Regions:
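Glycine-rich beta-strand-turn "strand-cap" elements at beta-sheet edges
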Residues: 1-4, 42-53, 79-97
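Short, well-ordered beta-strand segments in beta-rich or mixed alpha/beta enzyme
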Residues: 3-11, 42-73
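A generic signature of intrinsically disordered, low-complexity regions enriched in glycine/proline
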Residues: 12, 19-23, 61, 96
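Short amphipathic alpha-helical segments
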Residues: 15-43, 75-83
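Short, surface-exposed, polar/charged, turn-prone segments marking secondary-structure boundaries
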Residues: 33-38, 59-61, 67-72, 82-89, ...
């Protein structure tokens, strides 16, 4: 079975320090880890200080339906309130090198 890849870049404001963002992301990651269909997640931080997206989350889900159910839940919606601008999208792998 193939998994689907979530790529979610975050536009973290300059006045928000990394620790504050990481704390919120950690709570959301713990919740997602408990949801059906979640496979794994990795959070990446930009090396360049001028990057538009300071953090990018890359996660795997068993299906788009599992992901949608997780993000539409009232628990996740409450956690996501106040999250910096982000642009989540699901992808499927089409080539591997």
């Amino acid at each position: 079975m193939k998994n689907f890849v979530l790529i979610n870049p975050f536009e973290v404001p300059e006045d928000m320090d990394d620790d504050r963002f990481l704390e919120g992301w950690g709570r959301a990651a713990d919740y997602m880890r408990s949801r059906p269909g979640f496979v794994a997640s990795r959070l990446h931080r930009a090396v360049s200080p001028n990057s538009r997206f300071r953090f990018v989350n890359v996660a795997e889900w068993e299906s788009p339906q599992y992901f949608q159910a997780a993000v539409r839940s009232p628990e996740f919606q409450a956690m996501a309130a106040g999250t910096p601008s982000n642009y989540p999208a699901l992808y499927e792998v089409v080539r591997v090198v």
